[in-house]
Design a protein with these regions (language model features):
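Ribonuclease/tRNase effector modules and their secretory precursors
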Residues: 1-89
């Protein structure tokens, strides 16, 4: 089982980690019941702004429904999706 699933969208490569306890599932689904589509919807939402979380060395971005935690692996190209959750979580 691969550690990450790679998804290409609009010139970026997104890496989604598989869950440690359930490696057949993505972490975002196993822990928060969110999907790749949910994460990409937040990422590409032109009405949101990325905020740098200095304490945790990651970016946060949220729309009306979800919070996305992410960081660059290669600036402008490769994105590590740390987590994605509904705002109710």
């Amino acid at each position: 089982m691969p550690r990450y699933t790679e998804v290409r969208a609009d010139g970026f490569v997104f890496l989604f980690a598989h869950d440690d306890d359930a490696p057949e599932l993505l972490h975002i689904y196993a822990r928060h019941l969110t999907t790749i589509e949910d994460a990409l919807r937040v990422w590409f939402d032109s009405n949101v702004e990325d905020i740098w979380d200095k304490e945790h060395n990651r970016f946060e971005v949220q729309n009306d429904t979800h919070l996305l935690l992410w960081n660059w692996l290669t600036v402008g190209e490769r994105v590590l999706i740390i987590s994605c959750m509904t705002r109710e979580d």
